[in-house]
Amino acid sequence: MLIINDNNLSGLSLQRVNGTGELSVQFKDGRSRISRLYQEGAAKIRMPQAVTGPLEAILINTSGGLTGGDRLKWDVALDDGASAVITTQACERIYRSGGGEARIATRLKAAKGTRLAWLPQETILFNRSILSRRLDVELEEGAQMLVVEATVFGRLAMGERVVAARFADRWRVRLGGRVIHAEEFRLGPDVGAELQAPAVAGGACAMATVLMVCEQAGRHLETARAIIGEEGGCSLWRVGKASKLVVRLYAPDSYALRRRLCPLVALLNGKAGLPKVWTI
């Protein structure tokens, strides 16, 4: 008989999650099509059948979540004239860390005349989780982009409360080789107390950042503000020939956040609208 206790396990190293997914999209024969697809480890990419409109890709982490020491990488590139909507099968879950941080690194590249929408579902952080998330975007002049990243600290409906965690979120967005948007957001280790601060979240446990870059982003400003309401804000800048629309949303829980985030994404994503997996 084998008896397992803490002494038996102390010298063992846990299996780590490693996943890499790479997707390149081209415009050929009147449609946006796959030109390259690479999948490794826990990262999988699936494409629902679409006859018209942008290519839709659904990212899947087959491990079901991440914890300390896990690594997940996504790389998406659009060639001239292509369009794509990238989303995830489900919310990404970041579980309690037994040591080290979970890392999610995303790189997006969009050539001239492309339209790229990066629309993952929420990332949920559990108590004592540690996450480092990085987003790097390279846009050529004339490319259009919509990016959404939503983060939830615990699921209130499940009675979950995040008291301690660490979260680092780094964004770098370049247009024509020039940085037009940069973020360095950090929370922790006392996340529960920090979220209560009026200058941070005012007690909210769910938040989202939305970034749109295109020549006509300004036409959505007033409608976006009406959707956002008082729990958030929306600003507009000129960046060369393009405009940059930045939205911040916060809410007491993920359900309240989605009630405004979903119509906002549907507005900003044009004819492509809201990804179907968001409503399942």
From Swiss-Prot:
Q: Reply yes or no: does the keyword Membrane apply.
A: no
Query: What keyword terms does UniProt attach to this protein?
Result: Chaperone, Cytoplasm, Nickel insertion, Virulence
List the cysteine pairs that form cystine: none
Gene Ontology CC terms = cytoplasm
Q: What is its main location?
A: cytoplasm
Task: Please indicate if the UniProt record lists Transcription as a keyword.
Answer: no
Q: A GO molecular function for this record?
A: nickel cation binding
| PANTHER family (UniProt xref) | UREASE ACCESSORY PROTEIN D (PTHR33643:SF1)
Stored HAMAP family: UreD
Stated role: Required for maturation of urease via the functional incorporation of the urease nickel metallocenter. Disrupting the ure1 operon causes loss of urease activity, decreased resistance to low pH killing in vitro and decreased pathogen survival when inoculated in BALB/c mice by gavage.
Assembly behavior: UreD, UreF and UreG form a complex that acts as a GTP-hydrolysis-dependent molecular chaperone, activating the urease apoprotein by helping to assemble the nickel containing metallocenter of UreC. The UreE protein probably delivers the nickel.
- Name of this chain's protein: Urease accessory protein UreD 1
- Organism lineage: Bacteria, Pseudomonadati, Pseudomonadota, Alphaproteobacteria, Hyphomicrobiales
| Gene assigned in the entry | ureD1
